[in-house]
Amino acid sequence: MQCLAAALKDETNMSGGGEQADILPANYVVKDRWKVLKKIGGGGFGEIYEAMDLLTRENVALKVESAQQPKQVLKMEVAVLKKLQGKDHVCRFIGCGRNEKFNYVVMQLQGRNLADLRRSQPRGTFTLSTTLRLGKQILESIEAIHSVGFLHRDIKPSNFAMGRLPSTYRKCYMLDFGLARQYTNTTGDVRPPRNVAGFRGTVRYASVNAHKNREMGRHDDLWSLFYMLVEFAVGQLPWRKIKDKEQVGMIKEKYEHRMLLKHMPSEFHLFLDHIASLDYFTKPDYQLIMSVFENSMKERGIAENEAFDWEKAGTDALLSTSTSTPPQQNTRQTAAMFGVVNVTPVPGDLLRENTEDVLQGEHLSDQENAPPILPGRPSEGLGPSPHLVPHPGGPEAEVWEETDVNRNKLRINIGKSPCVEEEQSRGMGVPSSPVRAPPDSPTTPVRSLRYRRVNSPESERLSTADGRVELPERRSRMDLPGSPSRQACSSQPAQMLSVDTGHADRQASGRMDVSASVEQEALSNAFRSVPLAEEEDFDSKEWVIIDKETELKDFPPGAEPSTSGTTDEEPEELRPLPEEGEERRRLGAEPTVRPRGRSMQALAEEDLQHLPPQPLPPQLSQGDGRSETSQPPTPGSPSHSPLHSGPRPRRRESDPTGPQRQVFSVAPPFEVNGLPRAVPLSLPYQDFKRDLSDYRERARLLNRVRRVGFSHMLLTTPQVPLAPVQPQANGKEEEEEEEEDEEEEEEDEEEEEEEEEEEEEEEEEEEEEEEAAAAVALGEVLGPRSGSSSEGSERSTDRSQEGAPSTLLADDQKESRGRASMADGDLEPEEGSKTLVLVSPGDMKKSPVTAELAPDPDLGTLAALTPQHERPQPTGSQLDVSEPGTLSSVLKSEPKPPGPGAGLGAGTVTTGVGGVAVTSSPFTKVERTFVHIAEKTHLNVMSSGGQALRSEEFSAGGELGLELASDGGAVEEGARAPLENGLALSGLNGAEIEGSALSGAPRETPSEMATNSLPNGPALADGPAPVSPLEPSPEKVATISPRRHAMPGSRPRSRIPVLLSEEDTGSEPSGSLSAKERWSKRARPQQDLARLVMEKRQGRLLLRLASGASSSSSEEQRRASETLSGTGSEEDTPASEPAAALPRKSGRAAATRSRIPRPIGLRMPMPVAAQQPASRSHGAAPALDTAITSRLQLQTPPGSATAADLRPKQPPGRGLGPGRAQAGARPPAPRSPRLPASTSAARNASASPRSQSLSRRESPSPSHQARPGVPPPRGVPPARAQPDGTPSPGGSKKGPRGKLQAQRATTKGRAGGAEGRAGAR
């Protein structure tokens, strides 16, 4: 069990977070005998501490579980441990006890676990010499536990650890008996098997019987040993990358196991034949198997006293737990940690069943088992029930959150330098190379593994087989500390007990915190967040259920079979979003996880629909580049958005993990997206496309993201609101995270490792994409995706996962945003603001990147993202300070591709709304964005004037422009812009605002900032009135409400204010707060200006809306409502379209006319957003009354039905929940507050699928975009149809202006994406 101590390190984090960061504080003395030195691990079941025995002065492992835990595993642990005392390979039992707060077991402390040691090997494999000698010891330990009437049921590398003392360092100890079961009755006879038994064990190593939920027998432990030894020698198992328990079970059942013996000694055929012939009742011939090992050793001349591989490598098993653990913390490779995680809590019944069955006479009473109770500790008096709840659920939740935050922080660090760390820790320095073979340093192979994602399956297989696989696995589990699987696994005490240096490492990486919060989340999520990895780790029924529900969701046909990750991610979702640290963590995690979305594209949506009710686990692999994104979700379906948002920044952070990313990043997602976007891709193709785009985008995103990693994380999170896409991405990322968790936790990890490696490559690509996407995709990192940015993002999420990283990001962000707004009001502000930041730079750049500007957006996006930390400050000022020439030139030049103008407009909006984004954007891009914003009023009015005007012409657009001006840096420009071109400027600002709206949070952020009150931001979300700085804001807010809020419904407002104001500014002090402060500083000065500008604009807009733009404004509002999330997209559409070909005058002249079609065109880039905006526009056009109403709503004073609708919805959107539905509903809001809701449902249903299906089509090419929407682009009827759920009109309209729309859609993409997500929901 001392081994457990190491393993417990992680476990402790996993479960410790439940009650508090730690159940026991340092220096706490248990029973006046054991003084806590430090936590070395944690899991769902509890925490493992290294303690000093004050009587013997020796260091021991102290395994603690909260008395309030539903799953009490220590009882079984104690029962089995006591029965095994005196046997070889079993930790010495020192004492146990319980009090009202916790149960504890004290045992001998052990060293590193075998999973960690294998990963520490350069090839991730053990030599035959080490494999055979370990096999002998493990076989002896299995025979020993069987001899006392128990089955271990979770035989895996992380549950075996080497001793840490000179006398025991060459002895292997069995750990973690939390899943054990008594297979004999009191008379010693074999108990009759149950017809159906829950799955127990770890997926990778589980026997076929276990997969079939049959009663496990002695032979099943030997099957696990067989798989273990093959993995030791070969480095991986064929199902390593598959997380789905059912899929792995099918593979194992059909797989010709003799194929596994190719690299094994010929004698192993006897081993295989023998275990294959056994049944539940038959006693295995242990001696026959032992002879196989011995004969193989004789043949090869292997001596019993040869040095083990890690001894040769200098990785000393003697290393103290703490020594070995630190590397694990950073690397997630600690097998023990994995084991701890794997200890995943078994469902209460199962645990109870095990404990009750095993020993009803065994009690954790201090009097019986521990040294005499010292009178000095009455408080520790043993309570009659071990289930006493020491900490109330509330404190537990707080603790979980705390752990989450800590984990996030740790992860963030990991994310930033995980690659390097991994590489360095490996000693091979395999930073970007997919090869996983060189984990030189046993402790830190994990990161490396991550990077060792190998594109070629063989390469992955080899490297992974060597142990790299385990590293990623370890990493992924570690990365997913908050993942339910981890929590669940942690529940099993035995694994926790393993003393794995890896645990400490994992802990260091923050996994412990994650696991702690994960467990909490898992509990709250009913283990929906429990990842398959957890399932692999432990066989809880919940796991199985989750596997099917969440994992299978994640596995659409054609999608990669990495379902486990999804579940893993979910735990983070479960994690409360409110905490800043947590949010950050989520931010970091989300980007990471999303990449997984690729394989889960189709799934993602499906998942989204399913997930909305259940928050995706925050991507636990935040430390991981990929998993990172999934870290912070708030429980709840919309909380997915927080998950997405939180993870995204983390992804950014994991960017450093992106050496590979960089490599993969070579292919810009735009180009890939451009085509793939237009062409509906089969999931596999999409994945391929996404990979390509991921590679390109990652390359530039990598740099950009690396710099912006943290800020991006902070800033990006807000975009998360679009939950729908995220779920898809999440599904994939979750899978990855799950994978990672599993890998981390154990060989499951290895199995996942391959998956992880592949997915890691993909994920890293995706991570890069997402980071770029988060940064840029927020503003539509990918040009092609940008085309379908908002909706494309959503579609992209399925597809984006395949080919549009930025879309994925944007989508995810949007989805996150939408979802966050709906479900996670708290998360949303952060996400919103992050989204904002990301959007402006990314949007500007990325959207322009559609085709021609891809490189520019790349640079801009990279720079933009990079500066996000460094330059979030400049937001407003940067906008103004930026070189106008640059921006104008960019605008002028970029408008060619719809993206640039739209993108810039969107970017500007983001900048204005979210200066952070602008600041974040690289000065090239950022300057452009700022200049763009500043000049946008000028140049945009002129160069993008047509676009801007059109956008503005859309009443929502114009109003948005007003808000934008008042909100962000655009304010100053906005002041003149309205003067020069009330409409044009408005259009430009509108475009910007649209971008803002797209960003949702960004827009709110600026307005929030402008308002200079987070509450105001929320107020904005709630209603236009609250935004005093944006006097026009009410109107604008109304507009935003219809667009932004209408789209997400209740979350629209939430998108902007909640994200930035509540979450972004408050939750993310470093990124959000700084952003907010900057916003406030800039926004305040600009607020007056903004107010003036907005008032002027308002007047102008009202007049214009009343006059020529009445229908358009109506449409725009409706579209805005529909777009809510994709607000930016409608505005973007008009702005970008006009920018391309229409001058301001043209835009104005065609304001009414272009407004409708353009929004649709823009919508096209974002199918959902486009469709919704289109529907809005169409609906608005047919109903001038609606337009007028819309205008009034925009004005806020007149906002009769729409205004009222918007306002009520704004607060909800802001709050969360039905944000998407409401968002969907909102779009029709101008027409009718209620119709929008139903419409949103219909539209969401149709839009989300469409957005996904059209994402590529529409995004890449206008024609495609146009095609999807057959209805006339400017036809009002289609617009209405769309609100009803027919997104085609929007799509078709977008189609013609695919480019402009794409770029503007980039901005819009976010909004649209959110909208699409809402639809998907």
UniProtKB/Swiss-Prot annotation:
The modification Phosphoserine is found at S441, S540. Divalent metal cations. Mg(2+) or, to a lesser extent, Mn(2+), but not Ca(2+) or Zn(2+). Residues 458-478, 540-554, 573-588, 792-801 have a biased composition (Basic and acidic residues). Its main location: cytoplasm. Residues 363-397, 416-677, 714-908, 997-1092, 1104-1321 are annotated as: Disordered. Residues 1310-1321 have a biased composition (Gly residues). Its cofactor is Mg(2+); Mn(2+). GO terms for cellular component: cytoplasm; cytosol; microtubule associated complex; neuronal cell body; nucleoplasm; nucleus; perinuclear region of cytoplasm. One of its GO terms (molecular function) is tau protein binding. Expressed in the brain, particularly in cortical and hippocampal neurons. Weakly expressed in spinal cord and testis. No expression in adipose tissue, bladder, cervix, colon, esophagus, heart, kidney, liver, lung, ovary, placenta, prostate, skeletal muscle, small intestine, spleen, testis, thymus, thyroid or trachea. InterPro entries: CK1_Ser-Thr_kinase, Kinase-like_dom_sf, Prot_kinase_dom, Protein_kinase_ATP_BS, TTBK1_STKc. It is found in: Cytoplasm. Residues 637-646, 718-729, 1104-1114, 1234-1251, 1277-1291 have a biased composition (Low complexity). GO terms for biological process: learning or memory; negative regulation of gene expression; peptidyl-serine phosphorylation; peptidyl-threonine phosphorylation; peptidyl-tyrosine phosphorylation; positive regulation of astrocyte activation; positive regulation of gene expression; positive regulation of microglial cell activation. The active site is at D154 (proton acceptor). Its EC number is 2.7.11.1. CDD domains: STKc_TTBK1. ATP binds at I40, G41, G42, G43, G44, F45, G46, E47, I48, K63. Belongs to the protein kinase superfamily. CK1 Ser/Thr protein kinase family. This is Tau-tubulin kinase 1. It comes from Homo sapiens (Human). The gene is TTBK1.
